[in-house]
């Protein structure tokens, strides 16, 4: 039987406005840093995301270097997004960030325009 999110998932979570943007974020977000790499079984990652969402956690925080190894957290979350959350995408806030070394050479780290654009493109492909 396919997983169905809890009907009461928004009843107990506190949501706070983000500045004057109108966006509301849950008081707790799920960060996918060291718990979403290749060393964590995929089913455990799925369970974490499902449980978080059932508790009203709608913000999933990633980065291009999360894993380990770098990038694997975005890849794993992308698989879960397609398999479990495909019909729920409009209920989620997914953030990613860039800044740390990802590839060799002078353009593989920090904040140059080239690095940020390439990192965004790569993150979108992984997810």
Please state what every model-predicted region is.
Residues 1-93:
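N-terminal binding-site loop/beta-alpha segment at the start of enzyme catalytic domains
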Residues 103-127:
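Glycine/proline-rich, positively charged
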Residues 76-80, 93, 97, 115-122:
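Generic beta-strand or strand-like secondary-structure segments
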Residues 52, 97, 126:
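Conserved catalytic core of Hanks-type protein kinase domains
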Residues 84-111:
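Structural motif corresponding to the early beta-alpha repeats
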């Amino acid at each position: 039987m396919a997983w169905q999110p809890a009907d009461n998932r928004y009843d107990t979570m506190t949501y706070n406005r983000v500045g004057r943007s109108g966006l509301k974020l849950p008081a707790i977000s799920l960060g996918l840093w060291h718990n979403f790499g290749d060393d964590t079984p995929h089913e455990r990652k799925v369970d974490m995301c499902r449980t978080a969402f059932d508790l009203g956690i709608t913000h999933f925080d990633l980065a291009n270097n999360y894993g380990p190894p770098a990038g694997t957290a975005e890849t794993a979350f992308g698989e879960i997004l397609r398999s479990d959350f495909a019909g729920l995408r409009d209920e989620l806030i997914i953030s990613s960030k860039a800044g740390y070394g990802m590839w060799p050479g002078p353009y593989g780290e920090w904040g140059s325009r080239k690095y940020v654009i390439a990192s965004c493109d790569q993150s979108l492909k992984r997810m």
